[in-house]
Amino acid sequence: MTDKSIKELALSVGRPVEKLLEQAREAGLPQRTADDIITTEQQDTLVNYLKKVHGQESGNTGKIALKRKTTSTAKVASTSGKAKTINVEVRKKQVFAKPNPEQIAAEAKARAEAEAKARAEQQAREAAEQKARLQTEQKAKATLDAMRAAHQQDSAAQSAPKAAVVVEKRGGGTVKPAPKPAETLEQKKAREAQTAQLKATEEAARRKAAEEAQQRTLEQMRKMASKYSNDDATATIRVIDDSPLASGLVGQAYEDSFNQEDREIKRGGATTNPRAGKKGGRRGQEEQSFVNHNKRGLKSSQANKHGFEKPVKKQVYDVEIGSSIVVADLAQKMAIKVREVIKTLMKMGELVNQNQTIDQDTAALVVEEMGHNPVLVSDTQAEDNLLEAAEEARGEQTTRPPVVTIMGHVDHGKTSLLDRIRRSKVAAGEAGGITQHIGAYHVETDKGIITFLDTPGHAAFTSMRARGAKATDIVVLVVAADDGVMPQTAEAIDHARAAGTPIIVAINKMDKESADPDRVLNELTTKEIVPEEWGGDVPVAKVSAHTGQGIDELLDLILIQSELMELKASAEGAAQGVVIEARVDKGRGAVTSILVQNGTLNIGDLVLAGSSYGRVRAMSDENGKPIKSAGPSIPVEILGLPEAPMAGDEVLVVNDEKKAREVADARADREREKRIERQSAMRLENIMASMGKKDVPTVNVVLRTDVRGTLEALNAALHELSTDEVKVRVISSGVGAITESDVILAESSEAVLLGFNVRADTAARQKSDQDGIDIRYYSIIYELIDDVKDAMSGKLAPEHRETILGVAQVREVFRSSKFGAAAGCMVMEGVIHRNKPIRVLRDDVVIFQGELESLRRYKDVVDEVRAGMECGLAVKGYNDIKPLDKIEVYDVQIVKRSL
């Protein structure tokens, strides 16, 4: 940077001079006018201040941030009791900072000091413990030696008289023991004292050991009790704790020694025969009683009694409730009569019959009111089971190619950029030069395979862009360097953020002279997209689809981002994916574009997509070449489905055709219920609210398109055209050629028949020519929308616009035998016409509205009188004209309105 004026600096960075002066003043710089010179140092100061304001420290922070995303699965228990596999996505962000040598040295020194201090404290503590242990051992040894010496002394004193035995038998004499010396009183007292002391010591040691054992037992029991929250476990622990048997380990062992039969006897229950225990309920007890009576020779009174008895307690059922349920089915599940359920619903304010359907929340309230347990279940249980089985059959996950979606505003060069990458010419063959379908392609580069999804940029294709963001790993946001951020650019940013997808910005059209990438970056910053070169985390590539500039750099950024994300998928097991687009081709049937996300799709697989299922009869890549299999992140087109599924539907390969039919039928039923609900007639409250109001004009439309995505976009765009004065109603819409039934429907409903990228078949053309039905064909979406707007404008009521032509003031009133009151007037402004409507104003208040009966200039009858001239006039049907009244002549023009 060099020294320059504030004006030159503002021009170079593309910012207003006033804004730059304000930022310089906030940064503490002395510049106050546009001609003041700012030095290089002052420019650095300003840049550092702006970085600090926007959340970045000045200078090089020496930090690098890495973002990683890992995907795994976990099994959880579902409401039906079966395990359910869910996807778990963990996103990590690690920031690595360059270490500071001084900081490292200080931390190492502090750590060494802390370790030395801890080591010294540990040594001191060990020495104190060793000393205390030695003292305790010495005291115990001294006590034990004293007790042993006293015991030996007592034993020696008792055995000493017995040892003195005199043998006097010499040749036949008798042997007599020596006489026992008499024990003195002092010796007896000493011996008794030693014995009592020894017993007391042993008793104290035994009592202490028992108390310690009891304390340990109770502590273990309290820990076990804390693990259980039910009252029975707590009560059991409390009983054991309070019982006399809990005085030690013997009590616990005594309690655990009871078997099941002994416990029944101890608690006062009846002892049951082990064999009879196999029979349950009252019937088993009766048979056991009969056996016992027969053993005693007695006759049983219950031998001939019926085995079933009416339950005394009310049965409580677990009632499974889906998203909706019929009233009769709900009553059957609770084993009650339908009228009881209807009574309960009437108390809740719902008037229904037994064949009507109620929602899940209402049904749950009814079940609780009737005293049963509602169990809320999902209507998609069969689908969840299929997905769970498919997940369990998957093999080891490996690295897969990234799926990249190209998004941006219309005419910013998305398809042209993709053509440059693919070395093809797709954009040249598109109607109007704009993309109106999602296109899927995969490109093989030197560093790997990349799958691209090209989305439309027109405002009507919002749902397409949202689907593209959900099915992708990386979003490449294309912004024209000469146009900047536009509405669909901001919308694409919102879709990417909602899907949690990383963004790479590609500034296109860099070869143009009007390219201004700095302005584009400034506008992106306002949308919180901060590029890496400005301290953010969004990679930016400056490219040109026309010259090929920056294409390699863009591909490198995509591959680096995919490596950081660690994208993985399993190539084994049943295939799983998403429908990108679907259409109906004549002679081929439904053609479905699929992006495989997991597993491998093969020819002959049974595919379930939305509410349709079928076997794959043929499969081709995006170029139309036949293939036999497709792995993860590969887009393919398949044939074999009976009808075109909706774009965005999940695709799954199943092994059981019966399960596939059940899931498809359930989805079709749900879709039909939603459609009937949307198209149902107005309810009573809506009819009452609309009474007294005029009928709103309606433009009826029968729509046919080539693909599902375009059909969805056009339906949404046409519904948004409706206003309070005129409505647009799509009578019928579908994918494929216009048929004879469409012409008949358009004739009966007085609808406009529109075809987008489709044509009418022979029967439909003959029928339309015969009945005079006009069929309109379109290939560009905004042309179709403009024509519908014109049709709506024709239904609008015309606007009546008034224009004041002239004003005359009454000067004198005369009486005429022919006209009654005649006024002599002076034309104040404009022109007074004889054949135009007039108003009579008195004190600027309208008192009469009508027309002139006569207009004369002197005695001549004239058609008009200009300003500044006198005239005489008579008002038809009004004679109360007074002087100073004003006669206002006006004209009403009918103006055709438009939207």
UniProtKB/Swiss-Prot annotation:
Q: Pfam families of this UniProt entry?
A: EF-G_D2 (PF22042), GTP_EFTU (PF00009), IF-2 (PF11987), IF2_assoc (PF08364), IF2_N (PF04760)
One GO location term (cellular component): cytosol
According to the record, the residues making up region (G2) are 433-437
Give this protein's Gene Ontology molecular function annotations: GTP binding; GTPase activity; translation initiation factor activity
Q: Where in the cell is it found?
A: Cytoplasm
Region G1: start-end pairs = 408-415
Tell me the segments the record calls region G4. Answer: 508-511
Q: Which positions in this protein are listed as binding GTP?
A: 408-415, 454-458, 508-511
Region of interest (G5), ranges: 544-546
Task: Spell out the family assignment given in the record's similarity comment.
Answer: Belongs to the TRAFAC class translation factor GTPase superfamily. Classic translation factor GTPase family. IF-2 subfamily.
Name of the featured protein: Translation initiation factor IF-2
Q: Which organism is it from?
A: Acinetobacter baumannii (strain SDF)
